[in-house]
Amino acid sequence: MALDSAIKLEIISKFARGEKDTGSPEVQVALLSRRISDLTEHLKVNVKDHASRLGLLKLVAQRKHLLKYLKKTDYAKYSELISTLGIRDR
């Protein structure tokens, strides 16, 4: 399930470091978090959709790795990001 372009641009503009930044870890984590929440809502309705469940697990793992990298390189941005997105600190 892809994100709508308007939603994607809104998330990118909110978390981007610069004007044309789309690849920083903060932006990637924010986009993944939105996709994860959308997939979670989808799976509440479609309980037997196991392919989407596997996709969700892959997205969560990817976000976990990006958060680990961000925590290691810039802890201040990491703590700000998880508080903004409402993600637990592990």
UniProtKB/Swiss-Prot annotation:
Pfam families per the UniProt record, alphabetical: Ribosomal_S15
InterPro entries: Ribosomal_uS15, Ribosomal_uS15_bac-type, uS15_NS1_RNA-bd_sf
GO cellular component: cytosolic small ribosomal subunit
GO MF terms held by the record: rRNA binding; structural constituent of ribosome
Keywords, in A-Z order: Ribonucleoprotein, Ribosomal protein, RNA-binding, rRNA-binding
Transmembrane residue ranges: none
SMART domains named in the record: Ribosomal_S15
GO process annotations (BP): translation
Keyword Mitochondrion in annotation: no
Function: One of the primary rRNA binding proteins, it binds directly to 16S rRNA where it helps nucleate assembly of the platform of the 30S subunit by binding and bridging several RNA helices of the 16S rRNA.
Family annotation (NCBIfam families): S15_bact
UniProt record similarity statement: Belongs to the universal ribosomal protein uS15 family.
Subunit structure: Part of the 30S ribosomal subunit. Forms a bridge to the 50S subunit in the 70S ribosome, contacting the 23S rRNA.
PANTHER family: RIBOSOMAL PROTEIN S15, BACTERIAL AND ORGANELLAR (PTHR23321), SMALL RIBOSOMAL SUBUNIT PROTEIN US15M (PTHR23321:SF26)
Protein name: Small ribosomal subunit protein uS15
Organism: Wolinella succinogenes (strain ATCC 29543 / DSM 1740 / CCUG 13145 / JCM 31913 / LMG 7466 / NCTC 11488 / FDC 602W)
Gene of this entry: rpsO
